[in-house]
């Protein structure tokens, strides 16, 4: 069973609510009051410069702009993307025997969101697996599904990823007395969305898209995290003396905020992604010149500079810019879901030609990981 051909039977994606234009972001997420004077004086200019450099024209948030109520959960976002993938595959949810859900923040610590998604889809019996991960959650989920399908343990797998960034970007989440620019950078980069793939083994015909491989690597040993959010079972060393529960202390110290080492990410993220992509292509015995489409969903266009183009040529040995359409500007950077959203959009638009090799690759700065997946497009697509 190890050499079974695994097909991509369908893809789906979902973006909540109406598109939010750049000049509406603060209105939807809410203005941050109570910032210190020095930060407040710099904030408007910093935000406008960052939003302009990103090139993102619109994004989506699961927030009702009038009532400020949350309109989705991770499970509901994933369900909508999954149903679209199942529809593309012409399958019922009951045919799925392996369900994989990935997200950086589950809806609750227990039960797992994967089981909540199973409930929503009405799958009476299946194996469900939840992966806690940021951007590399998609290739991790695909790799697990791919190996299990090839082993013959399962016949049909549904791989989903959901990113509900707005829960920790909205103004009500912040303790503004402990906010720095490093806490706010991602506020104007991230958005909400979900994606899904249906994978199946054997008997799908030679004209179906084929999932050739998935790849993940973690290279952050000895490096400090590039992104943190201290909500979990173990507080930081300086808070370890506190009795549990310590959630209030975490909030009062502002340690619940999403923080990113902006300078380190700016200097390392692109090389991390491109080096990982090189390793993946080598592992797949694939030449960079053979790839027809590169899906590389960075948070914004400011990650695509002359320096990065030169870096890509040096690491990959070829110029990939003409083969790397950057669609994040159209729908927003919804974290790990962005690769699936772009893949789904391009598949539905007929952007892939029979025989095209399509690679999607992402990097995750939390502890310096990266990963991706490789598809050979089929003549019949999902039909």
Model-predicted segments: where are they?
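Condensing-enzyme catalytic core mediating Claisen C-C bond formation in acyl metabolism
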Residues: 1-71, 176, 182-267, 373-383
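Short coil/turn connectors at secondary-structure junctions
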Residues: 2-5, 93-97, 123-127, 151-157, ...
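Short beta-strand segments
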Residues: 9-12, 132, 157-163, 199, ...
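Conserved beta-ketoacyl condensing-enzyme motif
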Residues: 65-134, 280-307, 311
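Claisen-condensing/thiolase-fold acyl-transfer catalytic domains that form or cleave C-C bonds
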Residues: 79, 105-106, 124, 133-150, ...
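Active-site-adjacent elements of ketosynthase-type condensing enzymes
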Residues: 108-115, 162-180, 217-237, 301-309, ...
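Flexible, glycine-rich active-site loops centered on histidine and acidic residues
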Residues: 150-193
